[in-house]
């Protein structure tokens, strides 16, 4: 009876109650409730595990197959499953709420600690301010001061003095001396992570919360550059430490980490002597290397600490390896403080503080090495994001892409990024050698006759390099860009591959993966390239990076190009396309793959990398889509806001690095080199044209440079469009309470239907579109002017327009039947109806034609 009472908990429902029956079967009475025995509950639970929501036929089958359920009505079985699903949902919701509550509790603790740290910083700044006031009010002290310290020296300045100046001499070439350095490093790191040793300024846009990445801050007025992060993850401290120590897995600029010595300490910690190499981000600077002491230890409160610093002449200690062509940089006391959270998970404090020897690079590139925001994006935020990604994958809630586990897809991303870095840097110890130049130094050509050493033993490279001998050739170049947001440029290159890519070169790269021989192509304009289809594979938790497969549909032009008629596939990695991420590097890397897409497939990555050279202002930048006052206005009609936005963006600079890799057979090396050199020059020219088109699009006062003579300002055009529509049709197009020109422009821009204008010429081209129109055409305001009306309409649409065109010119408007058009990416778009009308200027002369596609959607 006791067992039956326990089992009743599983059976209580809206319509069943237990009654104490014997014989193991429930006794259904005239009431509404039934009591289930343990055997019956076990049978029901077994079916629930297989199918939580069985159909009526399945429930009847269950009663027939289980004699112990034969005396229960099918309706009661249905109620049991309903209640069971309800209890499961409640359990999951309760668990989720408990998790959120733990996160909020931990975040509250983190914010309180951050508030205490900021209070200390405020107190110190108040003290220093008073000290400065005292010095300014006592000029006589300044004139009579003969000490070596300046009168403006503050407490902060004293803190930033090199501690080596007061450190007593010691022998750091033994374990005791190294432990002393390690303990000093630990103390200095903790003072940065939780104290006020560095003035931290929070990065814009990084808001704390239960689902946010955490609190991100960068240094202000300190030696070197530093970044700091605090966040919560649902992994235990030991697992977090293991991930952070595996730096190449999350720091994309890390080439190698060699642990040369491991020394256990008496307190249970370890000291490691590490040599690390990092890639150069561009072809215009040398890579960096580091000689580091890393100290891992536990604190009394149960926290785990991993701290590190460079061993230099001032710190003492053994000398590290010296590698030619690398510039020795310095890690100042940095590390990770990992604290366990109540209920599971960890609270992480990350500090990265480095001196990258910026004076050794050309002056124009120094911002790459002097920007704490770039350091934060590349190292600090990258580490925290990687840990959060692993935690999310470990939870089992992340769907697999293409049938592959997240770890496999992550390996593909790492291989693409690493292969591109290898191509940009071209290290001699990987087998790279420079080819003689043709006299112009704009494109560098390097070749690698030992590709198996570069590709790696774990990759099947037999299909990539023929038995008669061959290798890899890389053509690369770097250039400076002005006024081009990196994210916007990379996004355009991704979405409009046909604007810069040569289909013959793509086919050559794809043919290298096949057994058939191939010839070196001649460059051609346009070519056979069909549509581009993007197949998503995976993305990171915050969508700052995504992996995808690109299918290029090929259409051969003649019989001798049969090899080109096959579809081609690219594995592509895109990152940094968020325009609001300060200091973020935007990158587009791709490699040809075959249809099998094996895990060990060889990859020859090529692509683009754009890095900002100037830090962004703290004010959020205007987006291209809806800062109408700055994006769409023209000439002197720009508002004050447009002027201020222009001043904040008109001087931005970035460095673009391009690298393309090709496999070659030995007897074709010179031909491939000539093709690669010319191809990269062609790509550079294409990117420059795109950059020139994109650059003014964000500068409100300069947008007149792309408009034809006589073009009206955007708000005037919006007024003409709305007024002409009302004049011809008698209906209002723009519903706005205000009569101001700005409100009309905003209403048209936000209109749900696609509205676009085209010129009154023999071959009409689009001159303007609202946001819905740009979305439908899958283009931008700049690229819009390269799209003709005839290009987007199908045969039926063109016939309908030709039939109604005289009516449009005579009566001013016409309704066109619904149909299908195509976007600039080749995707079909259906619409219920189209309206065409003549747009009249203030003097009633025809200015352009306007079209509105009603209720459009992608097919």
From Swiss-Prot:
Instruction: Write down the InterPro entries for this protein, in alphabetical order.
Output: HD, HD-Zip_III, Homeodomain-like_sf, MEKHLA, START-like_dom_sf, START_lipid-bd_dom
Keywords on record: Coiled coil, DNA-binding, Homeobox, Nucleus, Transcription, Transcription regulation
**Main localization (coarse):** nucleus
Q: Where is this region: Disordered?
A: 7-31, 146-172
Q: Which domain of life is it from?
A: Eukaryota
Q: Where is the composition biased (Polar residues)?
A: 146-164
Q: Which residues form a coiled coil?
A: 100-129
Compartment(s) of residence: Nucleus
Q: Which Gene3D superfamilies match?
A: 3.30.530.20, Homeodomain-like
Tissues in which the protein is found? Expressed in seedlings, roots, stems, leaf sheaths and blades and panicles.
Write out the GO MF terms: DNA binding; DNA-binding transcription factor activity; lipid binding
UniProt DNA-binding residue ranges? 29-92
Q: Where is the START domain?
A: 171-393
User: Among the entry's GO cellular component annotations, what is one?
Assistant: nucleus
The family assignment reads:
Belongs to the HD-ZIP homeobox family. Class III subfamily.
Summarizing the function annotation, the protein's role is: Probable transcription factor.
Q: Please give the name of this protein.
A: Homeobox-leucine zipper protein HOX32
The organism is: Oryza sativa subsp. indica
